[in-house]
Amino acid sequence: MSTFENKTAIISGGAEGIGLAIAHAVGARGMNVVIADINPDQLRIAEAELRQAGIPVLAAELDVADLGQWQDVADQAVKRFGKVHMVVNNAGVGGSGGTIEETDPKTWQWVLDVNLMGVVYGTQVTVPLMKAHGEGGWVVNVASMAGFGPLPLATPYTATKAAVVAMTEGWSLELAPEGIHACVLCPGFTQTRINLSERNKPARYASGAGAGSGAAKQLDGALKRVVDEGMPSNVVAERVIEALESKEMYVFTHPSYRPLAQVRFNAANAAFDRAAQSPLLAEYVNLPLPDFSQE
C-alpha cells in the first residue's frame, strides 16, 4: 500500500504550475486531492484534467489571504473525503519589482498576505484536523531558493520566502512528535506563471502606482526568460514525493544553486569569527548555548 493511498491533500494554488503538478503526483499514488485556487477559470480546467486522469478531486475557490475561506475549504474537504492528511501551501505571488522607494505599501501587503499569511492560515486550519485523526500527516510549504539569498529588486518576495523557511524549521520540531512531517520546498526557477501573478491580484491591493524603474522592467524581462526556461513542474512534484518518502525537511530541486545558499552561510561564519576576535566580547566567547528544554 502506498504511503499516500486513500489519504487526502489540500493544495493551494492547485490549478496550475507546481500545485497542479503535485496534485497529479499525489493523486497518481492514491490520494484524494482538493485543489484550491483564486482563479475559477483555471480551477475548472485543472479539475477536468485531474478527473480525466482518474484522480478523486474536489475544486474550491480560495483566496489564501482570507482565513474564513481556508476554513470553508477544509470543511468541504472533510465533508467530501472524511479526513485531511496533507496541506501543500503552494499559492504564491511575486509582486512587481522595484527599489525601496518604488515598492508601495499595497504591494508589500499583498505579498505578505499571500506568501506569508496564506501559509500560516493553511497550516493553522489543517494541522488540528491531522491531530484529530491521529494518523499523522504532512505540511508542505513552498518557499523558494530566494529564501536563502536576495533577488535584486524583489525584496517583498525574498523576505516572505525566507520567513516560510524559518516557520517550517520551527513547525518541523513542533509537529514531529505528532507524527506530522513538515518540510519546505525551495525550488529554483521552474516553469510556472509566477511572473504573471499580478493577473490574480484582488482589487483591494490595487495601488495606482506608476510603472517601475528601468532596472525593475529589465528584471521582469529576465525573470520571464528564466521561468520559461526553468525546470518542468512535474519534475519538481516528483522531487517532492521523493523527499516526503525519505522525510527530508529542506527540499531542494536545483543542486547547482548550492553556491547561492553558501554565500549567506560563509558570510555568517566570517561574522562569527570577527565577533570571537572582538576584545569587547572576550568574556562571552564560551557562553553555553541556551537550553529551552529545561523547565
Stretches found by the model and what they are:
Residues 2-34:
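Canonical Rossmann dinucleotide-binding motif of NAD(H)/NADP(H)-dependent dehydrogenases/reductases
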Residues 29, 149, 170-180:
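Active-site-adjacent segment of SDR/Rossmann-fold oxidoreductases
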Residues 40-41, 60-72, 105:
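The beta1-alpha1 cofactor-binding region of Rossmann-like NAD(H)/NADP(H)-dependent oxidoreductases
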Residues 98-100, 104-110:
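Substrate-binding pocket helix/loop in short-chain dehydrogenase/reductase
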Residues 123, 160:
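Active-site helix of classical SDR
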Residues 144:
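Residue(s) in the substrate-gating loop at a strand-loop-helix junction
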Residues 177-255:
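SDR active-site lid
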